[in-house]
């Protein structure tokens, strides 16, 4: 018995480890793992089914086939444990050792490991500095390589063909050494002196200047250093011993009918062993060289196929023409080990079934079919039955349950009480896709789901299925109840708004009961309270919509949180009074005293949560649902064909449009308009007609005429069912009603162009064949798009999760003063997002001052909640600097202050919260709602794009920012700066509108002037760009020679002549180097200086510029000297929707990016080349000028002699995020990405908090490039983790040394995921082979910091409740304590052992 205890103790020992290291295996290492050499390719004997000795399944090497029984049957049972049978050589032990014991094959000739050879960049090639082609030719026995040149003129590593080798042999005899095959490469690798090589390369690096050479050298140095530091030897990349996987991991299973199913690996191993044995035999026989060589090549190919089949040449196929699955295929891809078995496992204690509605459930309940519950909770029931003494053994209990005895159901009730279960609906796009509920037993076979949680699950009842999981341990139940219960997840983690919001029927019911109606039954009554209202409604004395006066008691919270009652008579309706009965204490009556649509209900729940907290909100939500369902049923609202009222005006609107189209057609035929213009106009006419029809229809539906009690006619909001459904937000929208009762409108062809004849019919009238046929395309495209969208969106989510998975809140406050300046989002005249929405739930980075004073309004480090935001709004603050994760100083993870409020809980975020995953889910989950297509702007839209003036909407004062201007002769301001912004400020100092003002715009009102709403404040010519003079004087032409640099053109219509500057391509050779310019001189002919500088005013003219002035004319400042026609770039497609979001997060460079100024200085143009011009920026402080070549066809925004700041736009276009980061810094690029992503989501009406996007941006900015190393051990130009540089610099500065300087890098999310420090995480994401190869060569150590790594090694994740566990481990490790392993006492062990023996181990004695 005491032995047994030892044995049990050995079994309970868990592996304790803190990191995982990956490295190259040396031949000795492989032999030390091995339990014996596999010498034969045989697997099992076909008659006895016993493994062959020394074969691939040999019992002597790998262990016994049956528990505690040797192969020949001499020793059986536990008492012989550990004996090695002298007859068959098998150790008597458990059979599970066949899963862990490895074997090996001694290769007769060394073979290269294909991963280190072919995985680009080739490690062997990089190390030897030889091209991959040459190495392959040596390895596959096509050429020789010189290993030792000796005294000859042959270089080491020189490649020789067969002929060259024979010549060399004749010439030098055995002076030199040249070989072929892997032996040659092995010899080369063995003889390398890594340290020496490293030194030489470093010296070379310091001497060289060429960028490409530097890159190459840095790569080699890094690789060599990796080998030196990790202790890997380069020759280990060539295998001399091949490990053999344990047999139970590559099983051979007999099928019925005498056939066998086998793992492909066995085939691949057999090939290797066969060829290896043949090679050994040939070597023993001293066979001719060519035969041996061929056999060696075959062996090399066999080993390649085993490691990574298909990586080189054709994949080896099995009997069924399918390529065999090699070791590499086992781990990579969706079906590989990582993604199939380690990151996603199937779990026990789970079941799935169809879902149906449970409208009578409470929010925290779900209906669970009895059958399912019985199956899921079986072990608990067995336990209870035994405990009660109702069953003597587990077996008896099992029988009782199978018979479904009455007592079993009682016990099931007990077991289930207070035991939450998890419900999950696939696809689980965000964390609300799994929530916990308390089960209620129901008859039937479908799970019942509470209607209010459908929004979170995105579930409907058209056949959706859901899975149920049972949390077993007490801890799991606790977590399910405290964190995952549906009642704890009322707010959405994406935007902090309620997600438990009524929809559809419930909304319709509440809307119906809160509407009022003129002259309804019972109008004008005065009631004592809501109770009486309900009584008279039930008695039929009053209609639900009757306008009445009711005595209402409201409760308000005072400072102490006590409720204070206010009672008053309110004008309301019967329905609203009845609804007031379910509203919790503490909310004002005004909240229900309106027609409640979906938005209003959502706001109501939100207010309730903020004022009263969780519990009342949950109860209120449930009550609203019950009430809504009840009154929706009472309302009897339904849809009939007569509800779709077609407006009378429709007919005349359509005939008007047809007349206009006919007119355009005539103009086209008489040649007044082009085909393109005609098409665009026709489409505009029909689009306008469609709008008019739908407006007429909505006006018609919206109101109805009724007679009030004084007998007069009155308009009131309509009670049309369809209108009510749309107006309340229950179902449908104006656009859909338009198709039912208006006209369907314009349709698109499959290629995306619009068909110019619209469908004038609607669905009520019905479509004719042609109209139906036109419609089919759109319908199909919709379905196809949806399928594509789902896949794309899922992939985006996966990449986002992968890049952000290891970001966890790790400390309370990092203490940084950095932050982002938040301002309201204003586009043109609309506030798209007020400041309040942007800063709510953030922490201030510095004190917020009261505008215009020095008083502190909000102190630094304040979490801005609703009350603070009210204060900011009251004092009209329009910019707040808040903390952001992008500027957080925490090394691993972020701090709670930089993140701010946990949106789903409403308080500051807890430590250990996995904000990275939450951010990824919040951005990815609405992905399916985004569009997939790129938008073609055509027709009406493109003409609207050419704006030519700014018209303000509100009154206020104008504020111009970064503006340079001059006053022209008529006293108006003319803008001469490039990126001027015009803001409209109201009387409280808040920004209401904001516009971009182009160069050359003439301002009607100046900075700080008051304007009225609707006033035009600036206008300009949209088609030409002017050149504006900043000084007055006389014009002097320079280098303007007719026929060489300019040509004179006369306009046919007006007879005015103008000078046109020739493009350099059109000039004669003499004119190529001339620079036409206009110089401004005073009356004496002296240069006039530009005010504020010592530069003479001269304006160089680019090609195509038009000058309408003559030499010597007097001009005044602000006049237009020349005009440059702008080519309208046609209609540009804007990428929208998902592809745009993906481009932003992948940080892809746009096709023709904007060109930004690299440094500040004065612009000039140098010598031009064929297709490019040379832009030179000379800094004012006299340091080196910066030059850049720009293609001629790019329109430049700057003139010669103009001053630019770093990061200014030189040529328009979409900005590349990398440039923004380099020139304007981290905050600018964050702002850019956040705003651009938000624009896409805002267009679809999806709300996502900025925080989530910032979290992803932080992960994209993880890396930095070292510019100068200082005293650190980084290499120049090396890319390292930003946190590592920070930590290293901190240590160096503490010791008074010079730190490294670096620049931050922006990586796309895929790149960033693969560049993470953790190789396990990267390997399980994409490009598994490459990641593992790199990691092995560098001998990387994975510290298991992220979530993914910990899931893969099967540990609690370092987030959430696992965070404390990991913190505790770290503490203990730091203190150097032993980590406690669960000790088994002798008593426990013997007791459990006895039970084991009774249960079945001991049953085999009496055979």
From Swiss-Prot:
Tell me the HAMAP family matching this sequence. Answer: RNApol_bact_RpoC (MF_01322)
This protein's name:
DNA-directed RNA polymerase subunit beta'
Q: Provide the residue positions that the database annotates as binding Zn(2+) 2.
A: 814, 888, 895, 898
Record-level GO cellular component terms: DNA-directed RNA polymerase complex
**Gene3D superfamilies noted in UniProt:** 1.10.132.30, 1.10.150.390, 1.10.1790.20, 1.10.40.90, 2.40.40.20, 2.40.50.100, RNA polymerase II, clamp domain, RNA polymerase Rpb1, domain 3
Native organism: Salmonella paratyphi A (strain ATCC 9150 / SARB42)
Family, as annotated:
Belongs to the RNA polymerase beta' chain family.
Return the SMART domains for the record: RPOLA_N
E.C. number(s) listed in UniProt: 2.7.7.6
Q: Which PANTHER family match?
A: DNA-DIRECTED RNA POLYMERASE (PTHR19376), DNA-DIRECTED RNA POLYMERASE SUBUNIT BETA (PTHR19376:SF54)
Q: Please list the GO terms describing molecular function.
A: DNA binding; DNA-directed RNA polymerase activity; magnesium ion binding; zinc ion binding
GO biological process: one example: DNA-templated transcription
* Pfam families, per the entry: RNA_pol_Rpb1_1, RNA_pol_Rpb1_2, RNA_pol_Rpb1_3, RNA_pol_Rpb1_4, RNA_pol_Rpb1_5
